[in-house]
Structures are given as structure tokens and as C-alpha cells.
């Protein structure tokens, strides 16, 4: 069986940016099991909507290819925020999707450097961050360079959930997610 790919995030709400990454993964890694993993409600954000709402928004956004992915309840079962390292252990060290911005701060993650040395990553561009430079300037990353798949061919969009929550810009989210948000009176 091919590797499992985990794409985790708050998805508060899931945006067009998240959708493009999921579509890229489905197309680029058609033989891999792709698991979308919303964080639990103990995650750092104080204005996070419930896990159930975020999972349902993901289901709405991904309904055209829901048969090619799994949206996991795993983090909903946890009693606190444990960090990425423990999640990757639970899923038996899958490929883990991160943005270049997360790669820049990976040295601050729980169980660093083990989270790097024991796992593999799919890295997406973000902002003007030079991914190879980040790797080359960190000894742990450099010594584990073979564990990073860099998605140089991904066309980045700079849409964030935070920007949607602040600006309520409807073009940042899919029509299905927008309808769900309005129907459930979220992010007011």
C-alpha cells in the first residue's frame, strides 16, 4: 500500500487555499490515502468554531471528491492538544503536509528534533519563503533533507482562514462553505 498523507489544520473555516492543496494532493498522489485532519478544540486559537462545524464545512467543500479522501475524527477524541509529533506517531509516521511558514518554525514544535528525524513531509510554498534556504540553514533539516518533498510546481494562493474571519471576504471560501457558515450563523 502507498503512503498515507495527512493534511492537518484548524480549517477555521476551510478556504479556497485549503481546497487547492487538497486537489493538488488528490491529483499528484492518486495512489496514496489522503487524510484531512482538523485540529481539536484545544488548539491555540481562542476563536475556533466547534470541531463538528469545521468537519462539516470540509465535507461540503470536498464533496466532489470525498471518495478520494478521508476526513478524520481522530483529534476530536483527544482530551487536550498534544502536538503534531504524537499525531504522526498515532498514524504510523505518514507523509505530513506543511507550508513553508511551518517549516520555518518547526524548531519550536513539540518533540523537536524527533518530529523531523522520525517523519517525512510534503512542503508547500507560502509567501516569499525560500524552502531550500530554510532547509539549508537548519542543521537538523539539512541532515534530513531527503525527508522533504517540495511542491515547487504548486501555484500558491495567499488565502488564510484568519483573513476570512477578519474581512468576511466571500471569495476566500467555496459557495458550499459560505452557505454552511450562513445557515449556521458562524463567524459573526
Segments the model singles out, each with a brief description of its role:
Residues 1-188:
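Nucleotidyltransferase catalytic core that binds NTPs
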Amino acid at each position: 500500500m502507498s503512503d498515507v498523507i495527512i493534511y492537518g489544520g484548524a480549517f477555521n473555516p476551510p478556504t479556497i487555499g485549503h481546497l487547492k492543496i487538497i486537489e493538488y494532493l488528490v491529483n499528484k498522489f492518486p495512489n496514496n490515502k489522503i487524510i484531512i485532519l482538523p485540529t481539536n478544540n484545544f488548539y491555540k486559537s481562542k476563536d475556533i468554531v466547534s470541531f463538528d462545524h469545521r468537519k462539516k464545512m470540509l465535507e461540503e467543500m470536498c464533496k466532489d471528491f470525498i471518495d478520494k479522501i478521508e476526513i478524520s475524527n481522530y483529534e476530536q477524541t483527544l482530551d487536550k492538544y498534544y502536538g503534531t509529533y504524537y499525531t504522526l506517531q498515532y498514524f504510523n509516521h505518514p507523509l505530513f503536509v506543511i507550508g513553508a511558514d511551518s517549516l520555518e518554525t518547526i524548531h519550536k514544535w513539540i518533540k523537536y528534533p524527533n518530529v523531523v528525524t522520525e517523519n517525512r513531509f510534503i512542503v508547500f510554498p507560502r509567501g516569499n519563503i525560500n524552502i531550500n534556504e530554510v532547509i539549508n540553514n537548519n542543521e537538523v533539516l539539512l541532515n534530513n533533507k531527503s525527508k522533504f518533498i517540495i511542491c515547487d510546481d504548486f501555484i500558491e494562493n495567499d488565502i488564510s482562514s484568519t483573513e476570512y474571519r477578519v474581512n468576511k471576504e466571500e471569495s476566500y471560501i467555496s459557495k458550499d462553505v459560505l452557505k454552511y457558515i450562513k445557515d449556521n450563523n458562524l463567524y459573526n
